[in-house]
Amino acid sequence: NEYSRFGSFDMLAENNREQLKGLIVDIAAGQNAQGTIGQKIGDIYNLAMDSVKLNADGVTPIQADLEKIASVKDKSEIVPLMAELAHSGVFPYFSFYVGADIMDSKSNLFQLYQGGISLGEREYYLDNDDVTTNIRNKYKEHIVKMFQLAGFDEAAAKKKMEAVMDIETRIAKASFSAVEQRNPAANYHKMSLDEL
């Protein structure tokens, strides 16, 4: 079983995912008129399922983003790049969104939330038991492989992995634990843009 728990709402969510998948597969298999929503859904699904094309493309689809990231030479260039990447759903250090004010649901606020750690929980970076260390080592191997797939040789990929782990570990140390994240009062720090 892949779930730590599986209640009635989880079952509903899983059934919903399966129904949506069935709809998408049916749409993608059909003949859809050019420019229709069905054609767009089918195209994106078929593209995502075409592993031969994806492997042949390599990093080409994200090459422009990689070049922008590589071109950053000064800290002042990071925030504008983060804003640009956010348009593609990439939030490197923290996430932000507009949502209801938890103290006044009639009001929406621009909200920031911790992020920047790929392993999900801060303990994966900070704990040193055998299981956690093994997970962290596998993650390091994954980072090296991703950099190699992006065109870096093994030595450069390992150096970049060390930089990634250093940054993510520092972010993890500054992050709230899962328990702290569940405390609404500890996570509510309403302020103006000037105060931010």
Residue ranges and their predicted role:
Residues 1-196:
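Zn2+-dependent metallopeptidase catalytic domains
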